Design a protein with these regions (language model features):
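Short glycine/proline-centered loop/turn elements that form peptide/ligand docking sites
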Residues: 193, 204-206, 210-211
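Acidic donor-binding loop of glycosyltransferase active sites
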Residues: 166, 180-193, 202
Length: 292
């Protein structure tokens, strides 16, 4: 497989722009005898036998892929973005570090929100590169970073950027991605984070680590064209600065923002009372009730 990693898997309808190297380890490369790989294989055998297969996505995100999956399962249902379905409920926003109040003082589309989820943290060298890129670019930022990782930041960074941005151990991600001041989401490209960014109409700078993250990042960059993968796959000061400039300032970034806004509108349409995801969700409930 090694010499074919750059090839696309166009034989799968809807994945014509995805490369072999974008797929998760254990699918077509890596340790195919691992527990994870064997689990994926067993899931692949079981899914066609399922009464229904439901996905946290929406039809218009990738219609060709949705049609392909629908042809392979007894009943295929897109029921997302689930974050938008749940947002219709009255919920108290948790913001213990005052991120949203800080955002109110920033201009529209100017802020970089940075978070890599709860599992992964970039290695020390990349954390330093992110900090250096932020400081040099002067881009306002909200950075969600575990407290134990603060020691990896350049000496004096927090003091020097006190007026430019905030570093917090936790941030209200959904609300930040909906805020008009947010201009870019720097992310690991976990699926929930990608959907939340799509739902907010926010372009992404992607730094995938494992699992489906590379595939998601590839889709963000070349399928939906709502962001870009970090240059050469890892953070460097200069590379990160160039990405921030491209997304927040250059014409390419304006196109990404426009595409992201269109997907946001389609996502909200999907979860409206007569939207496809809402109808599918009701269909899923009926299927579960009938089985019980």
């Amino acid at each position: 497989v090694g010499e074919r990693m750059e090839e696309t898997i166009g034989f799968i309808s809807g994945m014509e722009k995805i490369r072999v190297k974008d797929t998760p380890e254990g699918v077509v490369f890596g340790n195919l005898d691992s527990v994870f790989s064997k689990m994926l294989h067993q899931m692949g055998l079981a899914l066609p036998r399922a009464t229904a297969v439901f996905i946290n996505s929406f039809e218009d995100l990738d219609p060709t892929l949705a049609d392909n999956l629908r042809s392979r399962f007894k009943r295929y249902l897109n029921i997302g973005p689930l974050g938008l379905l749940s947002s219709t409920l009255q919920q108290l926003v948790q913001d213990p570090h005052g991120c949203l109040a800080w955002m109110e003082k920033r201009s529209s589309g100017s802020v970089a929100y940075i978070s890599f989820g709860t599992v992964m943290t970039p290695p020390p060298g990349e954390l330093a590169a992110i900090a250096e890129g932020l400081e040099s670019s002067k881009v306002p930022f909200v950075w969600s970073l575990k407290e134990k990782s603060l020691v990896q930041l350049p000496k004096g960074f927090l003091d020097r950027t006190r007026e430019q941005g905030i570093v917090v151990p936790w941030a209200p991600q959904v609300e930040l991605l909906k805020h008009e001041a947010t201009g870019v989401f720097v992310t690991h490209c976990g699926w929930n984070s990608v959907l939340e960014s799509v739902s907010g109409g926010v372009p992404m700078i992607c730094r995938p680590f494992f699992g489906d993250q590379r595939l998601n990042g590839r889709a963000v960059e070349v399928v939906w064209e709502i962001g870009m993968t970090i240059i050469n796959g890892v953070f460097t000061k200069d590379g990160f600065e160039k990405c921030l400039d491209k997304v927040l300032v250059q014409d390419d970034g304006k196109k990404m923002k426009c595409n992201a806004k269109k997907l946001k509108e389609l996502a909200y349409e999907a979860v409206s009372s007569k939207g496809r995801s809402s109808e599918n969700f009701r269909g899923l409930l009926d299927a579960v009730v009938n089985i019980i």
